[in-house]
Amino acid sequence: MAYTYKYPRPAVTADCVVMTREAAPRVLLIQRGNEPFKGCWAFPGGFMEMDETLEQCAVRELKEETGMEVTEDDIFAFGTFSAVDRDPRGR
């Protein structure tokens, strides 16, 4: 019999902030294709798979959403944001 969890498990996401190192820095944004916020500008990112690290998620999502290829060595933690009501889809 499969184990079931007594408590709900929150969804974990990785959002990627990509900046240039130019005199006038630029930031990479994507235009969301799905609800919520369809058509709005956002950082590339998405939900973490059960078998991947946060860094692996960031590498995968950046490639899926922009075609940009980076390695885990290119990724560093910028910040953690955990507001419960941050996403209308819930936790």
PLM regions and their residue ranges:
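Active-site segment of metal-dependent pyrophosphate-handling enzymes
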Residues: P10-V12, E55, V59, G67-R91
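N-terminal strand-loop-strand
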Residues: A2-A42, E55
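Short Pro/Gly-enriched beta-strand edge/turn motifs at strand-loop
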Residues: M1-A2, T80
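Hydrophobic alpha-helical positions that pack around
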Residues: P44, A58, L62
